[in-house]
Amino acid sequence: MEPLTRAQKELFDWLVSYIDETQHAPSIRQMMRAMNLRSPAPIQSRLERLRNKGYVDWTDGKARTLRILHQKPKGVSVIGELKGGELVEADAEEVEKIDFAPLMKKSSVFALRVMSNDLVDDFIVEGDMLILRSVTGEEEIEDGELVAASIKGGKIAIKRYYQDGTKVVLKASNNKGPGQELKASDVEIQGILMGVWRNFQGV
């Protein structure tokens, strides 16, 4: 790609850092503050140059759609797939990357350590770390999702969540019965399960 001027590189490096940390594009005003500029014109000019040189792109007419192009993938390499217990290696030129860093930077993500085998029916065992994200007030929770829930401000427990009209049903993983039916107002969802971290190194 065509090289950048010092001013263009300064803005580009800041954009890469900002988007990597926040997972969304900044506003023009934020770019102005970061570059110590009082007018949007220089920012818009630099952005156009970055776009023409193939470093960034955005959707015209829509705010905060700027994205970085041709960024080198980060994270853990997925070197292949296991089928029937045998490794099928991935194409060396098309190795997928899984980047956990953006997830871990979000303030809405938290972890709970599992200290029993009560969740074994969900393939979660003692020592596992549950990775959850906080729930916003307006968010709809899908039936059957594993959630961290508290009842009337009590202790938090991991349950499967079901909505039944104005009521909520919470079911324990090891309970084959109908579950606990509660008023929705009595249940506070602290988080939704995103994934499970299992460490085989004994750390």
Curated annotation (Swiss-Prot):
Stretches the record annotates as Binds hox promoter DNA? 1-88
Drop me one GO molecular function for this one.
serine-type endopeptidase activity
What InterPro entries does the entry give? Answer: LexA, LexA/Signal_pep-like_sf, LexA_DNA-bd_dom, LexA_repressor, Peptidase_S24_S26A/B/C, WH-like_DNA-bd_sf, WH_DNA-bd_sf
* Post-translational modification (record): 5 protein spots of the same molecular weight but different pI are seen in vivo; all of them bind DNA.
List the subcellular locations: Cytoplasm
Principal location class: cytoplasm
Protein keywords: Activator, Cytoplasm, DNA replication, DNA-binding, Repressor, Transcription, Transcription regulation
Family (UniProt): Belongs to the peptidase S24 family.
Q: What is known of its domains?
A: The N-terminal fragment (residues 1-88) binds hox promoter DNA.
Quaternary form? Monomer in solution, probably binds DNA as a dimer.
This one is known as Transcription regulator LexA
